[in-house]
Amino acid sequence: MSAACISYFGGKKLKLTHSYAGKELKHWNQAAFISGIERLLGLYKPETTLKQMNMMTSHDTDRMLDTYGGDEKRLKLSVIFSFLFPGAINIYYGEELGLPGAFNAGTRQGMPWKNEKIWDKDLLGLYKRLAALRKGDEAIKHGKFEFLKEYCDGRALAFRRSSGGEALLCLMNNSSSEVNLALKQGALGNKPGAVLNSGVKLKPAGPKKLTAVLAPWAYAVYRL
């Protein structure tokens, strides 16, 4: 999962040598990303996938900030996807603070507990909100994962987690241009309300229809 996220969300500044994977990563377009994730989900039974440890980085890799070439917009999309993906999220210490570090050149330094000036408080806040969302949501902890391909247009990415009567839908824009998505009636439930939103606006588009306007690198998570 980590290699797929880096290949898709990484962009032009992606560092192609990912030490933990032990191989060179190539850029993926959206079709390749969706295909790769679906193949990954098909390798094991759903109950096994839900117990897998999802680790984006470790002491044997570059830190995420270095992996994404310092591009925090892309980094955030990758973090959100990893938190909402089936399995147990594993966070290497300091990633939530936006610490830099290349493999064997800063990735194993001590945690800067007493130096809050270098903490990325905005990124830390995102990690906290995602952790709280995971903790209290059955759809994320136990639910099915599926891409909503009618809304995946090469720039916008849409996917859903669902379990019983609970569901979450995530929209994100992995591009530098605004995206307008015409949503089907009821796609976001009867009373759309985002539990996480950065740059997504909903506009009426006729009787009981909505258009989701996604700013560049925007994301939103809706509880259905």
Name the predicted role of every residue range.
Residues H59, S82, G94, L130, ...:
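Hydrophobic, well-ordered secondary-structure elements that form the walls
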Residues A4, F9-G11, L50, N54-E72, ...:
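Aromatic/acidic polysaccharide-binding cleft in carbohydrate-active enzymes
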Residues I89-Y93, E138-E146:
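Acidic/polar loop patches that form or flank catalytic/metal-binding clefts of enzymes
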Residues S58-D62, L97-L99, G164-E166, N174-S177, ...:
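Short, solvent-exposed loop/turn segments at secondary-structure junctions
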Residues L148-A187:
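Carbohydrate-binding surface patches
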Residues Q185-V200:
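Solvent-exposed beta-hairpin/edge-strand motifs
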Residues M1-Y44, F81, P100-R129, L133, ...:
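Active-site-proximal helices and loops of the catalytic beta/alpha 8
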Residues A205-L224:
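C-terminal beta-strand-rich structural cap/linker in extracellular carbohydrate-active enzymes
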